[in-house]
Amino acid sequence: MVVVDWLGLGLGSVAGALVSEGLKVLISEAKKVLAFKSVSNELASTMESLLPVIKEIESMQDGMELQDLKDTIDKALLLVEKCSHVEKWNIILKSKYTRKVEEINRKMLKFCQVQLQLLLFRNQLKSMPSMEAILNNYFQNINKKLDRLSGSPAPPLVSKRCSVPKLDNMVLVGLDWPLVELKKKLLDNSVVVVSGPPGCGKTTLVTKLCDDPEIEGEFKKIFYSVVSNTPNFRAIVQNLLQDNGCGAITFDDDSQAETGLRDLLEELTKDGRILLVLDDVWQGSEFLLRKFQIDLPDYKILVTSQFDFTSLWPTYHLVPLKYEYARSLLIQWASPPLHTSPDEYEDLLQKILKRCNGFPLVIEVVGISLKGQALYLWKGQVESWSEGETILGNANPTVRQRLQPSFNVLKPHLKECFMDMGSFLQDQKIRASLIIDIWMELYGRGSSSTNKFMLYLNELASQNLLKLVHLGTNKREDGFYNELLVTQHNILRELAIFQSELEPIMQRKKLNLEIREDNFPDECLNQPINARLLSIYTDDLFSSKWLEMDCPNVEALVLNISSLDYALPSFIAEMKKLKVLTIANHGFYPARLSNFSCLSSLPNLKRIRFEKVSVTLLDIPQLQLGSLKKLSFFMCSFGEVFYDTEDIDVSKALSNLQEIDIDYCYDLDELPYWIPEVVSLKTLSITNCNKLSQLPEAIGNLSRLEVLRMCSCMNLSELPEATERLSNLRSLDISHCLGLRKLPQEIGKLQKLENISMRKCSGCELPDSVRYLENLEVKCDEVTGLLWERLMPEMRNLRVHTEETEHNLKLLLTF
């Protein structure tokens, strides 16, 4: 073990004279720790920059005032000694000690920033000509390190409850006794499965258990993960590690992931008991559960599944609600209709509850559909249930049978939209803008606006067939729905798919294909697919070796991918009716796409959306997509933005492109050359791109631009002066651009500008020319509002709306 022998070095008599020797030992040892190369080298670099100043102080005094630094050196040496015994593959200990090394580095820098400067002034070292060069160089290095340290994210806060969903203060009915029974079974067994039919409240019960004070006291940490019917062991373990503050970690195979999981659990159980909740486990996933079974005394697993695993693990069977609880729940959702006698109301309740069969989800859906409705609609609902057999289920009533009437009462256009929801993977939080893009092309007629299809989403949500989740409290009214998520209960997604599958597979208007490894469905290879909406899922073992498929009528294609490398299928080139293409990656890292050339021959392709993929922006104009109207990127990686390498007339190559949407693309630091050359562009949205610091002056070439949206680009310092040439600009959104210091000097020339949104922009200077903006509406926070209120006497038509915005970014973790 390496320690500094301070007495041996003479520190007992001349304390400060040998602190530099201790620093030399620490620098030498830190450089030897290969498993922590980046952080140990950073620590060594900090100490090397400190060494010459310490030597100068030692030469002028006894150095007793360096005792704090000596103590830090002692701690650092002990930590370096521990790090030297950590193997490269031990990601848990590496993560743990990395944070500790970073903390030591912070202490060193803090000493340099405060205490060292006091010592220098006290000893008047700064006034000595011999020290001027040393100190200038030293403090320049320290300032750079402090800037870099302040710009890097702080060590993550690790919650006791990782990813456990919230119950949103919902009044829960009939779960008290099941909770007591489940707690007892869990405390008596290492693995417990909560089993029951879809929609009976399994997830709600388990979430309530995680909130229980006795359980919170019993377990030091609770992990929660949704498994679903497309389980990915590596992704689940990666998320568990990330929830515990280990950062982004890649596993080459499941064996590495198993080792990482064991290391994590062994480390955490040293501090207390651990509970892992695996929600929505499907039949056939027994192998997955066994990988999570690790023989540790303080580790338990709780599973929810609609399938019965009694033969493998202790199981708690959750039964439907008893009548009194079901009745109470229904009354919560649907109050009595007007002009109803107590007896008549009770009779209706009994008939409805008999149909609902005690399933909480069915009660909720039916209750919502009847809420506020007239008596005759209640009676009509009950009568419709008594007419003939339902097309769902079998001899025994199922949840789908209970949900079918809620689908039957939908208007025709809402039925189509509801069935479209089956094209997305389960347990997904889907951007409303993605769904609206598809509906615009499938059901839009000429001048149809996004508002029409947003209304469709609201109608489905009002009947509890899906849920809308706002990332912020401010609801968009300008057709921008990136901050609106759509979620759907799995059983409702199953209902949507069930409706689509009532026709023979080759005749369906909506078709979902699932390709695991390289196994293609046989029925899709020998005859044409007639679907308008085609969704293809491929797992992370898919090799991109496509077989030919004939899809002449496909207008909307959704590719749900999982592999790190993915080639677009060549048969896309023959989809001459294709209007909208969505490529959504559900893997942990951006997928590398190839074979873009298959898109260049599509005469009707109007919308392309990329999610979590790696693309080269220069590829886009080379495709010559003359019919393209909207191009969207979400959580994409672009790498280096290359400049023009070929002679491409962008105005012709993308002659109809009207909207570009770039959101949460973290490595975008500048716009590609071709965007300002898309003269047809009407809407440019660049949001949550924190590396972007400026826009090019060429942005002024977009003479048709009507909407410029730059929300939450933290490092954007200014808008180019050429912005004044955007003569058709109606709306400007710079909300949460915290680094923005000024608006263009001649912004007042934008006479068509009607709206400016600038929440959290109190440091932004308003030029005098804003006074010339007539009929302007400003949306901002209270502090920013003060900048505008001073102008109200001169701007009689100015309208300032102050509001606060809150964002729940945890909702984005599944993307």
Curated annotation (Swiss-Prot):
Transmembrane segments: none annotated. Probable disease resistance protein. The keyword Repeat applies. InterPro entries: Apaf_helical, Leu-rich_rpt, LRR_dom_sf, NB-ARC, P-loop_NTPase, Powdery_mildew-R_dom, WH-like_DNA-bd_sf. This is Probable disease resistance protein At5g66910. The LRR repeats probably act as specificity determinant of pathogen recognition. Keywords: ATP-binding, Leucine-rich repeat, Nucleotide-binding, Plant defense, Repeat. One of its GO terms (molecular function) is ADP binding. GO terms for biological process: defense response.
